[in-house]
């Protein structure tokens, strides 16, 4: 299960609803693994196993989910970005790579971690895309430990899609609120496309009410 927040660290109703759902599933004997961008260690894990996406090691420069990466915009900085190395030392370091014909970044075998804020700040779209990269790795790491993928609201839909593509497991997306609920008719087109992509690729879509269901059918053609 992919969420964006989990009690006690919540900013709205999404985390509370996710917690209630995990408790309900646990009462029916369903084991839930709940992935969040940032866990703090004080989450109630009596009913759920919480996975902190900020602690997941992912292959450096992994392009297996290239279509998600393409939604990010990168700005090149023409600078010797190697930490803790003086300019003279860097030149010597780089010359060795040029002499041997290797690229300065030999990425094979490297791993990295993404540090998520888990909030709703200025870098939200970037975090949503990076969360999908981590979700793909989570699906690989937990292969054989889950039967179903459940993604809560648009923030996690790319993550759900990535996990489905890696694992082949069915995807359920949970529509708590649409972009039309949040913004009226003046929707954010990026959010709308993420919502539509998530529902299109899902095997099942859960709407929290008949009103929401009708809105999904009317506005998204699902």
PLM regions: where:
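A short, glycine/small-residue-rich beta-strand->loop->alpha-helix junction that serves as a flexible
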Residues: 5-17, 42-43
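A short, active-site helix/loop in glycosyltransferases that binds the activated sugar's phosphate group
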Residues: 200-222
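Membrane-proximal helix-turn-helix segments that form the acceptor-binding/catalytic region
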Residues: 137-143, 188-205
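A conserved catalytic-core segment of Leloir-type glycosyltransferases
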Residues: 33-139
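Short amphipathic alpha-helix
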Residues: 15-26
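Active-site proximal beta-strand in glycosyltransferases
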Residues: 148-150, 157, 161-182, 195, ...
């Amino acid at each position: 299960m992919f969420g964006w927040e989990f009690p006690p660290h919540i900013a709205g109703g999404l985390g509370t609803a996710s917690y209630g759902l995990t408790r309900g599933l646990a009462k029916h004997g369903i084991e839930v693994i709940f992935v969040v961008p940032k866990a703090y260690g004080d989450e109630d894990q009596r009913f759920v196993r919480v996975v902190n996406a900020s602690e997941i090691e992912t292959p450096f420069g992994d392009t297996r989910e290239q279509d998600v990466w393409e939604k990010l915009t990168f700005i090149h900085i023409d600078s010797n970005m190697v930490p803790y190395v003086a300019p003279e030392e860097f030149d010597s370091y780089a010359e060795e790579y040029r002499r041997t014909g290797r690229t300065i970044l030999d990425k094979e075998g490297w791993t990295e971690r993404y540090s998520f804020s888990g909030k709703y700040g200025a870098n939200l779209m970037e975090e949503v895309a990076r969360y999908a990269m981590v979700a793909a790795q989570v699906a690989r790491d937990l292969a054989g430990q889950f039967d179903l993928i459940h993604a809560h609201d648009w923030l996690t839909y790319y993550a759900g899609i990535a996990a489905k593509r890696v694992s082949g497991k069915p995807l359920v997306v949970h529509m708590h609120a649409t972009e039309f609920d949040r913004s009226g008719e003046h929707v954010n087109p990026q959010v709308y496309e993420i919502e539509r992509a998530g529902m299109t690729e899902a095997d099942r879509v859960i709407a929290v009410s008949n009103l929401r269901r009708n809105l999904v059918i009317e506005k998204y053609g699902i």
